[in-house]
C-alpha cells in the first residue's frame, strides 16, 4: 500500500531559501527532478538565480552510467568548502545511486544533510527539516514505492515539451542492468490519471509529450486488483486515447522492449496522427548468443521483423537504438553479427556504450570479461559504421520540407552561424536559417517549416529560409520566461476503460486517492 503523502509535508520549511537540482542520468531522472523542483517550491523554496550560490543543492543520481559514483562524490567534495563558508547550506542526495549506496553516502561525504531513494522522493522536505533540527544527516531509504511520483507537484523544465510517466519499475531481469533492483517491479498508473496530466500540460501550451516507462509497452502489466488479468492492448489504447486530446500535436514514447512490442502498438502508431514517426528500439546486441546471456527475451530475427513492420506501416519512420559493445563473452564473431544487424536496420542514430561491470548485476560476476583495448576497438568500428549509415539516411532528406518545433537550446555554432534549432516530427535535430516568412521573433515552442539543404551524421541543416511560422502559446510562455507547473495527479493502479480526463482533475487531485 502507498503511504499517506501528507505525512511528509512540511509547509514553508524552505521559506526564503534558494535551491538547485542537479540531475545525472536518464529521462526518468530528468522527469523526477521536475517533481523534486515542484515539491521544493511547494515547501517554500525558490529556484536559485543564475550566478548565485544556492542554499540547498539536491543531487538526483544515476547508478547506470560508468563512474557515476566518482562523479557524484567528486562533485560533493567540491561543495564541502562552500558549505563550510555557509553553515546553513544543505546538501541532499537522492535517486538510483542513493538507493544503491544507502549505507555509504554519508560515510563517504559526512557533510551531506539528507539521503533519500527512488521510492520516497516526497520525504525530502521532511528530511531537510529534521536534519536542520537534529544537526545530523537524515537517511531514509525505503524498499518499496511509497506513492507514484505523479502525486507530487511538478515544475517543468520546458514550456513546449513535457514528460509523463506511465509506470515505474521494471519486470525484466537483464543481466547488465541494475535498474529493476533500484526502482522495483513495474507498477502502472491509471489511464485516466495519465490523460489528466497530459491534458494539464496541453492546457498550459505544451504541444509535445513523451510517455515514459522503463518498459513502456508493457504498460498494463500490474493492476491494484490481483484478480484482474493483464490487458496486453493497454498501451495501444493509451496511445489512441492521447490522440484524441485536442492541442496535443506530437506524442512520443520511450523506451519500449522488443520482446513485448506488438502489432497493435504499431497499428496505433500508424493510425494516430499525433504519434510521431519515430521509434527508439533498444537492440543491445546483434548476436543471439549474447542476447541470451543478457537475458534479452528476443533474437535478432524478431528485432529486424519489428523494424520491417514499422517501416511497412510508417514508411518514413526514424528508428534509433541502444547498443552495448564488449559484453562478457562477446567474440569477434558476435560483434560482426552486431555490425550485420546495424547494417540491415539502418538506424537514424544509435546510443552506443562500452560495457562496464555494474556491482550487483549478474554480468559483473561473469568470468569472461572482454579486455578494454578490444572493447575500445570494437566501439570505434561500430561508431564509424553508424556514422556512415546516419549520414546516408540523413542525406535522403535533402530537398524535403520539414516541420520543426523550435528548441530552447541548439547547436554549439548557432551564435556564429546565426541559425536556430528545431526538432522535426521524426525526432531529428535541424539547424535552420531563421530568415524568411516569419511572424515577429521566432521563440522556443513556435513551429516553423523549412527545406533541408545539407545533411550531417547527427543533424540536418536548412539554410533555405522559413516557409511558414506559427506562433504558439508555448512560444508566449518561453518569451515570458515561464514553464508549466502540474498539480498532483492521483495514484490509481487499476486499468478501467479509457476515457477523457476530467477537466479539473489535475487541479483538484491533492490526495493519494484513486479515480479516473
Curated annotation (Swiss-Prot):
Its EC number is 2.8.4.3. Its cofactor is [4Fe-4S] cluster. Residues 395-466 form the TRAM domain. Coiled coil: none annotated. It catalyses: N(6)-dimethylallyladenosine(37) in tRNA + (sulfur carrier)-SH + AH2 + 2 S-adenosyl-L-methionine = 2-methylsulfanyl-N(6)-dimethylallyladenosine(37) in tRNA + (sulfur carrier)-H + 5'-deoxyadenosine + L-methionine + A + S-adenosyl-L-homocysteine + 2 H(+). It holds the Pfam family UPF0004. Keywords: 4Fe-4S, Cytoplasm, Iron, Iron-sulfur, Metal-binding, S-adenosyl-L-methionine, Transferase, tRNA processing. Residues 412-438 have a biased composition (Basic and acidic residues). [4Fe-4S] cluster 2 binds at residues 170, 174, 177. GO terms for molecular function: 4 iron, 4 sulfur cluster binding; metal ion binding; N6-isopentenyladenosine methylthiotransferase activity. HAMAP family: tRNA_metthiotr_MiaB (MF_01864). Catalyzes the methylthiolation of N6-(dimethylallyl)adenosine (i(6)A), leading to the formation of 2-methylthio-N6-(dimethylallyl)adenosine (ms(2)i(6)A) at position 37 in tRNAs that read codons beginning with uridine. Belongs to the methylthiotransferase family. MiaB subfamily. Monomer. This is tRNA-2-methylthio-N(6)-dimethylallyladenosine synthase.
Amino acid at each position: 500500500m502507498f503511504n499517506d503523502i501528507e505525512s511528509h509535508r512540511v509547509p514553508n520549511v524552505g521559506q526564503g531559501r534558494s535551491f538547485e537540482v542537479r540531475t545525472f542520468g536518464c529521462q526518468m531522472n530528468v522527469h523526477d527532478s521536475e517533481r523534486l523542483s515542484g515539491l521544493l517550491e511547494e515547501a517554500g523554496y525558490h529556484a536559485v538565480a543564475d550566478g548565485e550560490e544556492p542554499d540547498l543543492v539536491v543531487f538526483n543520481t544515476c547508478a547506470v552510467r560508468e563512474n557515476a559514483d566518482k562523479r557524484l562524490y567528486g562533485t560533493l567534495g567540491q561543495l564541502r568548502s562552500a558549505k563550510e563558508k555557509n553553515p546553513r547550506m544543505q546538501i541532499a542526495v537522492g535517486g538510483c545511486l542513493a538507493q544503491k549506496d544507502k549505507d555509504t553516502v554519508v560515510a563517504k561525504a559526512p557533510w551531506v544533510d539528507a539521503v533519500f531513494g527512488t521510492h520516497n522522493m516526497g520525504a525530502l522536505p521532511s528530511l531537510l527539516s529534521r536534519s536542520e533540527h537534529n544537526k545530523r544527516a537524515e537517511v531514509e531509504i525505503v524498499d518499496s514505492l511509497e506513492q507514484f511520483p505523479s502525486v507530487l507537484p511538478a515544475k517543468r523544465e520546458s514550456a513546449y515539451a513535457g514528460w509523463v510517466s506511465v509506470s515505474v519499475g521494471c519486470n525484466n531481469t537483464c543481466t547488465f542492468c541494475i535498474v529493476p533492483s533500484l526502482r522495483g517491479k513495474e507498477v502502472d498508473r491509471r489511464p485516466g490519471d495519465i490523460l489528466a496530466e497530459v491534458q494539464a500540460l496541453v492546457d498550459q501550451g505544451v504541444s509535445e509529450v513523451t510517455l515514459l516507462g522503463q518498459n513502456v509497452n508493457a504498460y498494463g502489466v500490474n493492476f491494484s486488483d490481483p484478480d484482474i488479468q493483464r490487458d496486453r492492448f493497454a498501451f495501444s489504447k493509451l496511445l489512441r486515447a492521447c490522440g484524441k486530446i485536442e492541442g496535443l500535436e506530437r506524442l512520443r514514447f520511450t523506451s519500449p522492449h522488443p520482446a513485448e512490442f506488438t502489432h497493435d502498438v504499431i497499428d496505433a502508431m500508424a493510425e494516430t496522427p499525433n504519434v510521431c514517426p519515430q521509434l527508439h528500439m533498444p537492440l543491445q546486441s546483434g548476436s543471439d548468443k549474447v542476447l541470451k546471456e543478457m537475458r534479452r527475451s528476443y533474437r535478432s530475427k524478431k528485432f529486424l521483423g519489428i523494424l520491417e513492420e514499422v517501416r511497412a506501416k510508417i514508411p518514413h519512420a526514424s528508428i534509433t537504438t541502444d547498443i552495448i559493445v564488449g559484453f562478457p563473452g562477446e567474440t569477434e564473431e558476435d560483434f560482426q553479427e552486431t555490425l550485420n544487424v546495424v547494417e540491415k536496420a539502418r538506424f537514424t542514430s544509435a546510443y552506443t556504450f562500452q560495457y562496464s561491470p555494474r556491482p550487483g548485476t549478474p554480468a559483473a560476476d561473469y568470468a569472461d570479461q572482454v579486455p578494454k583495448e578490444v572493447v575500445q576497438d570494437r566501439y570505434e568500428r561500430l561508431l564509424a559504421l553508424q556514422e556512415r549509415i546516419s549520414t546516408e539516411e540523413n542525406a535522403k532528406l535533402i530537398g524535403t520540407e520539414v516541420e520543426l518545433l523550435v528548441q530552447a537550446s541548439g547547436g554549439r555554432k548557432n551564435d556564429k552561424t546565426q541559425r536556430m534549432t528545431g526538432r522535426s516530427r521524426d525526432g531529428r535535430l535541424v539547424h535552420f536559417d531563421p530568415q524568411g516568412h516569419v511572424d515577429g521573433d521566432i521563440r522556443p515552442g513556435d513551429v516553423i517549416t523549412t527545406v533541408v539543404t545539407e545533411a550531417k551524421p547527427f543533424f540536418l541543416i536548412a539554410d533555405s529560409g522559413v516557409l511558414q511560422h506559427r506562433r504558439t502559446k508555448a512560444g508566449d510562455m518561453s518569451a515570458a520566461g515561464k514553464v508549466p507547473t502540474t498539480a498532483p495527479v492521483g495514484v490509481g493502479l487499476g486499468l478501467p476503460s479509457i476515457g477523457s480526463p476530467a477537466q479539473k482533475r489535475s487541479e483538484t487531485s491533492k490526495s493519494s486517492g484513486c479515480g479516473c
